[in-house]
Amino acid sequence: MSLCSPVPLLLVAILWSPKLAIVSGWVCGILAMFLIPVWQPVHWGQIFAEHLVCFSALGYAGCFGNDKRWKVLCGILLASVIKICGHTLSGVLFFSQNAWDGWGAWGYSLAYNFSQNIPLCLLSGAIVLALPLGSLKHAIGKERLA
């Protein structure tokens, strides 16, 4: 994923609905498989774990609502935790052979995925929280679709 790439899916989840964002995440995950030129799965399960689960996890950002900033923050945190857990589990299952000496599959996957995804989720969450969500809801003409 590129820097701040979760922002559009987080906004779909928060401004429209979690269901729409989950489906959008599936679509993004499928498209990413074809549009990322160097991506090659090591196992068919990786397609499910990394591309469908982790992309759709961002849809959970809208499950607490969008009427208060703390609800948006809780949703972003939940979505980030689910996404990081999915990537970490995928790392253990499919990339344990890359583990550094003495680290083991879990240690390697946690270190790798935390170093990649925590900054990504923090920056994306900060951007979404800095946006005028009330004005955006008004501009798109939606208060909440559920």
Locate each region found by the language model.
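Hydrophobic transmembrane alpha-helices
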Residues: 1-15, 19-20
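Small-polar-interrupted transmembrane alpha-helices in polytopic inner-membrane proteins
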Residues: 24-36, 78
